[in-house]
Curated annotation (Swiss-Prot):
GO CC, alphabetical: plasma membrane
The protein, known as: Ammonium transporter 2 member 2
Gene name for this UniProt entry: AMT2-2
Family from the record: Belongs to the ammonia transporter channel (TC 1.A.11.2) family.
Membrane topology reported for the UniProt record: Multi-pass membrane protein
Species: Oryza sativa subsp. japonica (Rice)
Length: 501
């Protein structure tokens, strides 16, 4: 009788000894972080690309969408070359980490870690260990890239309709390296604001305040659009703009839900609070439009949605849901006031041509959210996510100290972005014009790219403003009449509601 030796058991899909599944890796955490990264990516691609291509005048649809597309792609390359480790690597300075690539498998397949995030008490004892999520470094690199990319895409909203695309191509990598990485390390990567106790749960300061301030600063240096464009900048497709806004709203589930670096209770609270704040802010903004202007504005509703999402971001996982509703009410009213009332009364604000009012929807809403988080953050939720023991808002016993920290963090981010953005643009301006020429601005996409979003004219013919046969007005009473260049270009714009700033 021959006995057959049993073959050794084959590793199953959930066994811990698979080469690709080390003991520290949690498959659920990995799956959620990749999904969250994808959600945030969808906010930029196609969310903001669609919004930018539809909310602007028809002649700027291609250029506006491409500015977002280019920013997204260029950010990824710079991020893996040096940017990620400048924002989340080993400490170099109190506000900056050491540069280095995130390209080798030796680095990317190891357990993710934030090396500078350990927090020590005043006596030198370790109070909070460094953050080490249960997935590979590659997942963290991807997730944090999406945050960096959307910051630059948001910044572009201040510059639509006149910035030289070559200057924009030079600006994006420089701003990422010298501005974004500083804010990210200071507040998230273990820098001095992180260690001091400034709360920025998911980017109210790192992303929204920085993009709003930098966008406004860049708009000042680049200069305004043509007078005719500033006076009439009608969206070319409001329905498409709403679709892009919907992608932005739903994608925020990954934005705030992925911030704890795990699918835990903090993430669930954050996602619920995010939606509540967005809805409340949208309704508040719409009601104010009806009260003061007699009718609801669809563009205003999208702006209100945006400010609600931005305002809740600094504290999404740290406040009660009733607090999220309160924050939504402030988000729908304070930026509305600064945009619709204060802006029009300020000579300086009127001088700076912030195309999509990014300063109001992101900088103002971001600071507002940071301040309200300093008031409303609960000790129970802070204990689950914050690095310093006993963190809480003013209304829960922190005293005025936490509010002071929130204001101090906002001041640092504002001043840094003001100085660095100005320096970058002044340097670029020595070699590349920041603004397109007036002749190019009259034409738009065709001058900038040789392409048009809506290129068919008449019976399948591409419209060409330089060819008389395609610009003559026919029909009864109009045969043989030629419009002036200004009239033809004006007629190309869509009719509809516009953002009047």
């Amino acid at each position: 009788m021959h006995l057959r030796m049993a073959s050794p058991p084959q590793p199953g899909p959930y066994m811990p000894d698979l080469p690709a599944v080390p003991a520290w890796l949690n498959k659920g955490d990995t799956a959620w972080q990749l999904v969250a990264a994808t959600f945030v990516g969808i906010q930029s691609m196609p969310g903001l690309v669609v919004i930018y291509g539809s909310i602007v005048k028809k002649k700027w649809a291609v250029n506006s969408a491409f500015m977002a597309l280019y920013a997204y792609a260029s950010t990824l390359i710079v991020w893996v070359l040096v940017g990620f480790r400048m924002a989340f690597g080993d400490r170099l300075l109190p506000f900056w980490a050491k540069a280095g690539p995130a390209l080798t498998q030796d680095f990317l397949v190891q357990r993710a870690v934030f090396p500078a995030t350990a927090h020590y008490g005043s006596d030198g004892t370790l109070e909070t260990p460094r953050t080490e999520p249960f997935y590979a470094e590659a997942a963290l690199v991807l997730f944090e890239f999406e945050f960096a990319a959307i910051t630059l895409v948001l910044l572009a909203g201040s510059l639509l309709g006149r910035m030289n695309i070559k200057a924009w191509m030079a600006f994006t990598p420089l701003w990422l390296l010298f501005s974004y990485t500083v804010g990210a390390f200071s507040l998230w990567g273990g820098g001095f604001l992180y260690q001091w106790g400034v709360i920025d749960y998911s980017g109210g300061y790192v992303i929204h305040l920085s993009s709003g301030v930098a966008g406004f600063t860049a708009a000042y240096w680049v200069g305004p659009r043509l007078k005719s464009d500033r006076e009439r900048f009608s969206p070319n497709n409001i329905l498409l703009m709403i679709a892009g806004g919907g992608l932005l709203w739903l994608g925020w589930a990954g934005f705030n839900g992925g911030a704890p670096y795990a699918p835990n209770v903090t993430a669930t609270v954050a996602v619920l609070n995010t939606n509540v704040s967005a809805a409340t802010s949208l309704l508040t903004w719409t009601c104010l439009d009806v009260i003061f202007f007699g009718k609801p504005s669809v563009i205003g509703a999208v702006q209100g949605m945006m400010t609600g999402l931005v305002c809740i971001t600094p504290g999404a996982g740290l406040v009660h849901t009733w607090s999220a509703m309160l924050m939504g009410m402030f988000a729908g009213s304070v930026p509305w006031f600064t945009m619709m009332i204060l802006h029009k009364k300020s000579t300086f604000l009127m001088k700076v041509d912030d195309t999509l009012a990014v300063f109001h929807t992101h900088a103002v809403a971001g600071i507002l959210g940071g301040v309200l988080t300093g008031l409303l953050a609960t000790p129970e939720l802070c204990a689950l996510d914050c690095p310093i023991p006993n963190m809480r808002g003013v209304f829960y016993g922190s005293g005025i100290g936490q509010l002071g920290k929130q204001l101090g963090g906002a001041l640092f981010v504002t001043v840094w972005n003001l100085i660095v953005t100005s320096a970058i643009l002044l340097c670029i301006g020595l070699f590349i014009p920041l603004r397109m020429s007036d002749d190019q601005l009259m034409i738009g996409d065709d001058a900038a790219h040789g392409e048009e979003a809506y290129a068919l004219w008449g019976d399948g013919e591409k419209f060409d403003v330089t060819r008389p046969e395609t610009t003559r007005t026919g029909g009864a009473g109009g045969a043989g009449r030629e419009d002036t260049m200004e009239q033809r270009l004006t007629n190309m714009g869509a009719r509809g509601v516009t953002i009047q700033l």
